[in-house]
């Protein structure tokens, strides 16, 4: 199958918020764009403008003022396959400019996803795009590859879903994988709400993108939340200005750390779940007592929602409080963690030992979509 050395596999990490795509062996994705499909809210009146019935990614983002934006992936699960096909089509033909029928394709997914989801992914790759071979890998496992470890617990938090995956000597421990449907998009929504309470109105799908930008540029995680609140009350040291697209300037203060605090206190937005620190701890406690020490010493952060300044220190502090007192805790936050899932995929797909792992088109034709459960962990 992969005899021709010139055939570079494609690596496509379909996130809830961003698609990261590129070629195996590269050190960073070539294409990174929002997982958005936009459709016009109004009818076109200018003839010859070349208006389309749908826009994908950055183009949808730039025309967001006149479009209704939809995300085909929610909480890591694809809920609109027609839009998802549009995104993949855009990825291959417009962004990477490749013919998908000429390259093996490595896709990623969140753990504990419905089986039907990966079957449908497999079906579309082989039937719509005629891929010669494909594979579906678990996101967190790829992040561990990227960090150069074979043992550790990965906390992967993106836009739609967070999960903790303990891995020992390269084996994921499925019984200890925990999934938390609390991630970046919920934080954006929380910030929209906080800002609305302050009298700034953000309601449309386009305005949500502005709030996401505010979150990414200005939010941080407090080491001590209560103390930070006190500081914010008495001094203006935490205040920052942000200029909206129309030139209006808004000032944001305690919102900067109140928004991402939700990761540690989901009850702030009415969720009953444990925070990311407890989830990580619970995941470790579900593992064999003999390997916990290795997991505590290798807590690897990955995904865009782990990009908040202060997250590693706070994580370290919270886990230290939960763990046995003599335990050595180490939280690893690689600088490239925003793309570490993709980077891990790039490493995996270019390993010579991986080449027999691909699901070939012939195997798919023989067994159908369910082959994905036999061939991919």
Curated annotation (Swiss-Prot):
The modification N-acetylalanine is found at residue 2. It is found in: Cytoplasm, Cytoskeleton. CDD domains: ASKHA_NBD_actin. The keyword Endoplasmic reticulum does not apply. Pfam families: Actin (PF00022). GO terms for biological process: developmental growth; root hair elongation. GO terms for cellular component: cytoskeleton; cytosol; endoplasmic reticulum; plant-type cell wall; plasma membrane; plasmodesma. InterPro entries: Actin, Actin/actin-like_CS, Actin_CS, ATPase_NBD. GO terms for molecular function: ATP binding; hydrolase activity; structural constituent of cytoskeleton. Keywords: Acetylation, ATP-binding, Cytoplasm, Cytoskeleton, Hydrolase, Nucleotide-binding. It catalyses: ATP + H2O = ADP + phosphate + H(+). Its EC number is 3.6.4.-. Preferentially expressed in mature pollen, pollen tubes, young embryo sac, and organ primordia. Little or no reproductive-gene expression is detected in vegetative organs, such as root, stems, leaves, sepals and petals. Polymerization of globular actin (G-actin) leads to a structural filament (F-actin) in the form of a two-stranded helix. The binding of profilin to monomeric G-actin cause the sequestration of actin into profilactin complexes, and prevents the polymerization. Actins are highly conserved proteins that are involved in various types of cell motility and are ubiquitously expressed in all eukaryotic cells. Essential component of cell cytoskeleton; plays an important role in cytoplasmic streaming, cell shape determination, cell division, organelle movement and extension growth. This is considered as one of the reproductive actins. There are 8 actin genes in A.thaliana. Belongs to the actin family. This is Actin-1. It comes from Arabidopsis thaliana. The gene is ACT1.
């Amino acid at each position: 199958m992969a005899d021709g050395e010139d055939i570079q596999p494609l690596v496509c990490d379909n996130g809830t918020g961003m698609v990261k795509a590129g070629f195996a062996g590269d050190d960073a994705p070539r294409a990174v764009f929002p997982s958005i499909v936009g459709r016009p809210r109004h009818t076109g009146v200018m003839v010859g403008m070349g208006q389309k019935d749908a826009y994908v990614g950055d183009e949808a983002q730039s025309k967001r003022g006149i479009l209704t934006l939809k995300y085909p992936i929610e909480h890591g699960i694809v809920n609109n396959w027609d839009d998802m096909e549009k995104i993949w089509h855009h990825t291959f033909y417009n962004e990477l400019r490749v013919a998908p029928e000429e390259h093996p394709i490595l896709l990623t997914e969140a753990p504990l996803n419905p089986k039907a989801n990966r079957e449908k992914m497999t079906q579309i790759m082989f039937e719509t795009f005629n891929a010669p071979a494909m594979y579906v890998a678990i996101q967190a496992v790829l992040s561990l590859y990227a960090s150069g470890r074979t043992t550790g617990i990965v906390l992967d938090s993106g836009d739609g879903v967070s999960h903790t995956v303990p891995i020992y000597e390269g084996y994921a421990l499925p019984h200890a994988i925990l999934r938390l449907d609390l991630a970046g998009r919920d934080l954006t929504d929380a910030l929209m709400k906080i800002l609305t309470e302050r009298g700034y109105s953000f309601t449309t799908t386009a305005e949500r993108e502005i709030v996401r930008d505010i979150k990414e540029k200005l939010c941080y995680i407090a080491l001590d939340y209560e103390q930070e609140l006190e500081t914010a009350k008495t001094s203006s040291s935490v205040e920052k200005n942000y200029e909206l697209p129309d030139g209006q300037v808004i000032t944001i203060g305690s919102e900067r750390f109140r928004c991402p605090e939700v990761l540690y206190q989901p009850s702030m937005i009415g969720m009953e779940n444990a925070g990311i620190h407890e989830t990580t701890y619970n995941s470790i406690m579900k593992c064999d007592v003999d390997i916990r020490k290795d997991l505590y010493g290798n807590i690897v952060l990955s995904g865009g929602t782990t990009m908040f300044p202060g997250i590693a220190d706070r994580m370290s502090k919270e886990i230290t409080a939960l763990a046995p007192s003599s335990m050595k805790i180490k939280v690893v936050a690689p600088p490239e963690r925003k793309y570490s899932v993709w980077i891990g995929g790039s490493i995996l797909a270019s390993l010579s030992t991986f080449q027999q792992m691909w699901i070939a088109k012939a195997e798919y034709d023989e067994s159908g979509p369910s082959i994905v459960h036999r061939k991919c962990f």
